[in-house]
Structure formats: C-alpha cells, structure tokens
Amino acid sequence: MAQKMDCGAGLLGFQAEASVEDSTLLMQTLMEAIQISEAPPTNQATAAASGPNASPQSSQPPSANEVADIQALAAATKPKTAFKAQNATTKGPNAAYDFSQALNAKEIPSTPPTVAFKAPNAPSKGPNAAYDFSQAATTSELTAKPEMAFKAQNATTKVGPNATYNFSPSLNANEMVNTQPKTAFKAWNDTTKAPTAETQTQNINQAKMATSQADIEADPGPGICESDGAAAQTSADGSQAQNLESRTIIRGKRTRKINNLNVEESSSGDQRRAPLAPGTWRSAPVPITTQSPPGAPPNVLWQTPLAWQNPSGWQNQPARQTPPARQSPPARQTPPAWQNPVAWQNPVIWPNPVIWQNPVIWPNPIVWPGPVVWPNPLAWQNPPGWQTPPGWQTPPGWQGPPDWQGPPDWPLPPDWPLPPDWPLPTDWPLPPDWIPTDWPVPPDWQNLRPSPNLRPSPNSRASQNLGASQPRDVALLQERANKLVKYLMLKDYTKVPIKRSEMLRDIIREYTDVYPEIIERACFVLEKKFGIQLKEIDKEEHLYILISTPESLAGILGTTKDTPKLGLLLVILGVIFMNGNRASEAVLWEALRKMGLRPGVRHPLLGDLRKLLTYEFVKQKYLDYRRVPNSNPPEYEFLWGLRSYHETSKMKVLRFIAEVQKRDPRDWTAQFMEAADEALDALDAAAAEAEARAEARTRMGIGDEAVSGPWSWDDIEFELLTWDEEGDFGDPWSRIPFTFWARYHQNARSRFPQTFAGPIIGPGGTASANFAANFGAIGFFWVE
C-alpha cells in the first residue's frame, strides 16, 4: 500500500509538466504495455511487479487464461478515439486523466478511449494535469461512453481546458460482450475457446500499474519508484517474444487509422453516462455459440468447441469392422509316389499283397525282421533259375501297401518250412493236397462253414490214397444223425421248408466239418425206417422238405388232420395247370364259388379260405402268389410252388382230373404232352440223384448198420426246435403226421400198408381219396 501511494505522488508531480502530446504518447504506450502485461508472468520480476500493486477492489490476481484473453480482445479492438499528430496543442491544459480502475477483460475491445496524448516531443499545455492510476475503472463505463471524433494532423482538439477523463468505474464483462464490435481479428477470435468463469472476471490493475511504471522508467520523471519500474520492464521483456506478432499487427493497424481519420469530438467528457456499480470479478460464464462439430445432434449449444464433450445419451457410431478375408483351403498335396528301395534284378509283379504277421525264416540266410509287404500286386512269376542273392537283406524300416494280400493260386516252394505257430488267414484258400500232417485245427474253426477246398478231416495228408476212408468215430456221427432225423420230422409238421443253417445251428453244431456225412446218414434212416425222403428244393437258399417215397404209396393225400386242406390243394393245382400253369385270382375264386367256397366266409374244416390260399399254402411252398406284371390296378395270380413239383406232378394231377370226369387224359393233348415231358425229366433227375447218393454212401461207409440197434425218441432236445404258433408243447410227438408213424411200423413189420391209397392208384382206396374225388367232381366239371 505504501508503494502505491508513492507511485501516485510521483505521477502527480509528473502531471504538472505533461502536455497533451505527452498524454497521447503515454496513452498509446499504456495500451501496448497492457498487451504485454496480459501475458502470464514468466519470471519472478513479473510476479513481484503484479503482487504489491494489486487494486484493493480485486478479490484475486489475474490468472494466465485471463491475461491471454485480455491480449486477444485488445488486439481485435477497433479504437474509436483518434490521436492528434505531433505538434498538436490541447485546449484544456488542466485536463485530468484518471485511470484509477482497470478495465475488465471483455470490455477493452469496445472501449473508446476519450483522452488524447501528445507526441513524444510536444510540450505539456497543462502544467496541472494529473494522471491518476490509483483506482481501476470498470469496463462497463468505458463501453457506455459516447463516440469521440478527432481531427487529422495539425488539428486542435475542441475540448475544454478543464476536461476530465474519468476511467474510475470498470465495465462489467456481460456489458462488454454485447457492445463488442467486429474487428479484423474475428477469424482468430472464433477459433479461440470461450473462457470459463474464472477467465472472464479479472483485475487488470496489476497490469496497468506495471505498464505505467515501465513508461516512467523509459522517460524518468519525479517521484517514480525504482522497484516498480524495474519489475514492469522485466515483465514486458519476458512477454515481448510471445506477443511480438500481435503487437506488430495492432500497431500497424492503429497507425493507418490515425493517419486516415479527421473527425471531431461529438460530445464532451461531462456528457458521459453515469458510472455503473463495479461488477464482480467472477461473473457467470458467457456461452458462445459456435458451429457444431460433424456428427453431433442438431440444436445443441457447444460452449467449448475444442474441449468438446458428448451430450448425455449420444454415442459415437462404432466403426464398421471389415470382416477378415476368407482364407482359401490349403492346396491338396499329392502323396509322393512310392518307390521300391530294393533293386530287383528281374521285374517282380505280385498279383495280391501278402502281409506276414510273424517273422519268416527262409532257407537262405535271410532273416525277415517283421511284416513284409510286397509292392506291385501283378502276377509275379520268377524266371527259371532265378535265386535271391545270398547277401541280400530287407531294410529294417521298409514297408509297402498295408492292404496287399497274397495270390490265392500262388504255389509255395516245396522246401519252404513254415513256423509251427504261424496262423494262416481264415479266408485264404489252400490247395487240397497242401495241408500239413501235424497241422492243428483251430478250435474256432469247428463252428464255421467248411470250405469246399478243405478236406473233411484235418489229417487228410496222412494217407496218399485220397479215396480211402479216414479213421473217425462212426458211432458219434450216427448218434448225431439220429437226432437230426427226429428234428426233421418235427420241423416238417408245419410244412415249412427247413433251412440248412437251422440244422447246423441246432443239431450238427461242433461237427460242422463233417456235416454232409451226418445229413446223408439221416436221409438213409428216413428212407429205410419211415419211407420219407429229404429233398433239397432250393439250391441257392438250401431249403429242404420231406416227401414220401414211391414205394410207400402214401402220396400227397395221407390220412392226417390236414387231409381236407390237401384235397382242396389238389383241386387248386388242377385249376392252375389247366389254365396254362397260372390262374388269376378272379378265375380261381370263381371255380371255388361253384364248390360252395367263398372268400370271407369261414369254413368249418378249412377255416379262413383267403388266409389259407395266400398265406399258409404260400409259406409251405405249395403255391406261389405274385402280382401280375404291369397291372393297374394291381392284380394277382397263383402258380405252382416248389413243394408241389416234388410231392406231386402234372401227370398225376391230369389223371386225377380225367378220373373225375371219366375221360382219358389224352383228351387234353396239350396238357398231356406237357405232363409227359415233365415226367420224363423227373425220372432222369431222380435216377441221377439216386446214383449220386449211392456213391456217396459207399464212400462214407453207410450201410445197414445205420438203422441197426435200439431206437429211442428220448434223446432229442426239444428246446432247440422252432415251433409254429399252433404247436402243442405238452405233447410234441402228436405233431408227427400219421403217415410217418404208419411208415415206421410198416418197416418194422417189413410189409407195406394197404390202407393208404391215393388218387394215383384209384378212386376207391380210402376216405381221403373219396374226399378228393368229391371235391374234384365239383371243381372240374367245367373242364372240357
């Protein structure tokens, strides 16, 4: 406070000698010093200069942002006050200049200075002029001052001698913004951020005091404090480099305007508006509307364009991510061609690969380390005289194709010994004469179906004579054959063909390797004891049936519970044969209607006729029920089944029809010739079959001993049988047809039964023959 009073006394003493020209120069210098002092203090001298000279009306020292804002606004100000040129005289020598209060930051650009200063060399016109910088003036007062007009050079100011210039009140920041004119630096001001509340309110008293002290130091006068002047000079030097460009532009612009102005002052200083109350130095922030940034929502006022913040709820659009480029699959690599690392002297071509599982020791000194896979599977034949080099060995890590197998017809060397524990593949056929004598048969081979290339006995190589009988247990084979006889008789009760696989599974079992002999022994027992023949009706599916032999005289119509069904079957077979070996379903049902049999009506003896014809007879292979080709809607027809061809013949059926009609079979010439040809073919086939059976039985040693000895039915295992749903499990032997029992007792008495006569012999044999004749008389009346 003491420094401030001393500085004020020095200025009063300097006022007595100052003229108007001096005042003009001082005002210009003061404005430039204010611009310099607005920069933030860069050294301790600036801080010292601004510290003790603070105005008592300010609440806090100006910050760096406030000083920068004052500099920007001062540079953009278009001064409305003209200054006189050099040698101009002031009419009022006693004019007083009061700079007691500093201008506000926002009010400087629009403040028209109302005081003129003399040139540097002009004499002071008013000895009593005083310059008071003790109080800061508000910016609001400067903004409201009337405009002043000044004359050009060498013109006198028409100001009264006692004009007083008072800058005591300072303008408010809000008032300055509304009256601020646009200057040449508008573009620069638009890019400047709007100051915050702290930068809008400031006290420039410290800057003005520092500027006045700097001017006094440059032109020393009485009563100037040395310390304050030095501090101001230091502050001006520190910010000179920072504000050099702005000072040059502002000074040049002011000079041009001073030289071009020739105006007069329109009003005196006494006509100024009343000073307003000093505003607070922390006024509210002034929003400055700028252009919205790209991508922002409309109708939003942005206060700080550079320090831009997103409004609530607004998010930046996420950048679109480019999907990663699709990677092409790696190029398929061609497997390298397999090369044979062994240099063969002669071309070796194997037909099929052979994989050796165990080491094989060759007669030559060559030891195979492991599995050997031969390349090139094409018919390999060694030239005569070719031998393996004595010193050649297979590389230890060499392997060929894993799926290569040896040829089936490749002969092994005669002197090539095989390891005793080396197993042969199960599906590798061997020559019939190449089976070692001491070669054991694996236990699991007993349940497999034997190959025709294998001998019945594993010790077949023991004898050089292949036709000689081999030592075996005949009693065990005959015992298994007897079980098979009982099994076949029970299975034939349902008239369903018997499969060979069922016989192997249920009866033969572990004797699979000799099953042909067991089956042949069973056939011999059936023929000699029961007069029944085991007939294979299907060579592909291996289906067997039991039929009566010609010597038994028990044809298709035996005295059984199925006699009515078999009588109807004989009529149906006749209808089919007389219609060209096929009869449509409509034709057959028309013939049965004339006999009083209709589909859908249950018969007391025959049951359901439709099920009997289309299911039971078809399942028993008596009939074949199939669809007519290319029929729309579909139609079905009946044909003879496989069993019918073996249990009867076309000639027998034709004789039956002729006997019913009391006509000669030769009356139907076409049917008679066809039946005769079939009968001749059947006789030739039966003769060839009988010859083959006799040869096989001689080779197997089957004779009368096969039927000798006690016969027991208690050794059969009933749980192995596959019964029909109509079977009686309590009394299984009741299922055996009566014909079988009659044939058995006939053979026991060594005579033929005379009570079983079929339609083949004559119409007056038995009740069954009469039943068939009655059906035939009704069913074949339409036959011409």
From Swiss-Prot:
The gene is MAGED1. It comes from Sus scrofa (Pig). Residues 41-67, 195-339, 379-418, 441-471 are annotated as: Disordered. Residues 195-214, 232-246, 259-269, 306-320 have a biased composition (Polar residues). GO terms for molecular function: identical protein binding. Residues 302-450 are annotated as: 22 X 6 AA tandem repeats of W-[PQ]-X-P-X-X. It is found in: Cytoplasm; Cell membrane; Nucleus. GO terms for cellular component: chromatin; cytoplasm; nucleus; plasma membrane; protein-containing complex. It is a peripheral membrane protein. Keywords: Biological rhythms, Cell membrane, Cytoplasm, Membrane, Nucleus, Phosphoprotein, Repeat, Tumor antigen, Ubl conjugation pathway. Interacts with DLX5, DLX7 and MSX2 and forms homomultimers. Interacts with UNC5A. Interacts with TRIM28 and PJA1. Interacts with NGFR/p75NTR and RORA. It holds the Pfam family MAGE. GO terms for biological process: circadian regulation of gene expression; negative regulation of epithelial cell proliferation. Residues 477-675 form the MAGE domain. This is Melanoma-associated antigen D1. InterPro entries: MAGE, MAGE_WH1, MAGE_WH2, MHD_dom. PROSITE patterns: MAGE. Its main location: cytoplasm. Residues 404-418 have a biased composition (Pro residues). Residues 47-65, 383-403, 447-461 have a biased composition (Low complexity). PANTHER family: MELANOMA-ASSOCIATED ANTIGEN D1 (PTHR11736:SF28), MELANOMA-ASSOCIATED ANTIGEN MAGE ANTIGEN (PTHR11736). The modification Phosphotyrosine is found at Y97. Involved in the apoptotic response after nerve growth factor (NGF) binding in neuronal cells. Inhibits cell cycle progression, and facilitates NGFR-mediated apoptosis. May act as a regulator of the function of DLX family members. May enhance ubiquitin ligase activity of RING-type zinc finger-containing E3 ubiquitin-protein ligases. Proposed to act through recruitment and/or stabilization of the Ubl-conjugating enzyme (E2) at the E3:substrate complex. Plays a role in the circadian rhythm regulation.
